[in-house]
């Protein structure tokens, strides 16, 4: 299966506010070596991507930072369905970000399938103005 197909099988998994912790979200951390994370309240977009790529036997930076995907794969400006989209949060210089699988785009928005999209695995739009770039693998 492709990484996008694996990610789609997880569609709808969500973290719970407070307790209990959803084991289907916690596995994104524990099965990729982040055993120090014990709840689903920790930001998990990068953990989700790490887990998906691990299932596809594709090596990633395996860090819990979305922007670590800037150093993954090959940069592309000809993005296709399933490529990785990387965004900044707060400010471009903050080091904070978001990462997900490219689905489609409009004039102003990029739609990605990712983890921790409003606390769930789902498709969500992000402003093109916050795009750092796309990578293919």
Q: Model regions: which residues?
A:
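N-terminal capping segments
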Residues: 1-56
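...with weaker cross-activation on analogous glycine-rich loops/strands in unrelated enzymes
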Residues: 58-122
């Amino acid at each position: 299966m492709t990484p996008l197909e694996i990610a789609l099988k997880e569609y709808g998994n969500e973290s719970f506010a407070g307790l209990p912790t959803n084991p289907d979200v916690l596995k994104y951390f524990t099965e990729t070596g982040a055993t120090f994370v014990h709840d689903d309240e920790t930001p998990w977009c990068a953990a989700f991507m790490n887990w998906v790529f691990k299932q596809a036997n594709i090596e990633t930076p395996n860090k819990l930072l979305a922007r670590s995907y800037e150093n993954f794969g090959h940069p592309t400006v000809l993005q296709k369905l399933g490529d990785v989209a990387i965004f900044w949060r707060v400010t471009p210089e903050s080091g904070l970000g978001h990462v997900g699988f490219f689905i489609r785009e409009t004039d102003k928005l990029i739609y990605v399938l990712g983890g921790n999209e409003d606390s769930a695995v789902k498709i969500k739009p992000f402003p093109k103005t916050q795009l750092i770039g796309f990578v293919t693998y």
